[in-house]
């Protein structure tokens, strides 16, 4: 999905599956996205901060703001962070992030990682389209 929304990189903290396993589920789309691995959440945060990348985490925590009321700032690169279904976004990343959540009026309280990422990507692209040219989107995602 990252490639479909114009993202150029996928930052992964922890284990990165073999490329052949990723390709089996994503097809040729994986060829359009660089996968950048990080051993620890701290390594990722340090990298993002050194590069001036905004970290925006999707997580159900008290300080999170609803996605529908969040205004993305496209003055610097944006990194959308989602955690796995079991443990969520690591605290080391949450404490260094702007935190948002996806409002869900139904009976469930969480989505799987891919669904959550797609919703965050969609809202980010939607806001970007309203603010600038779609051709330049990959410069910021």
What are these regions (language model features)?
Residues 1-141:
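Post-transcriptional modification and biogenesis factors for structured RNAs
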């Amino acid at each position: 999905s990252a490639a479909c929304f114009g993202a150029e990189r996928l930052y992964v903290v922890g284990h990165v599956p073999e490329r052949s396993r990723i390709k089996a589920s994503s097809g040729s789309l994986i060829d359009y996205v660089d996968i950048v691995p990080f051993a620890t959440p701290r390594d990722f945060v340090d990298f993002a901060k050194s590069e001036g990348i905004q970290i925006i985490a999707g997580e159900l925590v008290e300080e999170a703001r609803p996605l529908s009321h969040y205004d993305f700032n496209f003055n610097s690169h944006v990194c959308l962070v989602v955690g796995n279904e079991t443990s969520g976004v690591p605290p080391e990343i949450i404490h260094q992030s702007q935190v948002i959540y996806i409002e869900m009026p139904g009976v469930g309280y969480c989505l799987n990682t891919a669904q959550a990422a797609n919703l965050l990507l969609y809202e980010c692209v939607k806001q970007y389209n309203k603010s600038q040219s779609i051709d330049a989107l990959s410069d910021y995602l």
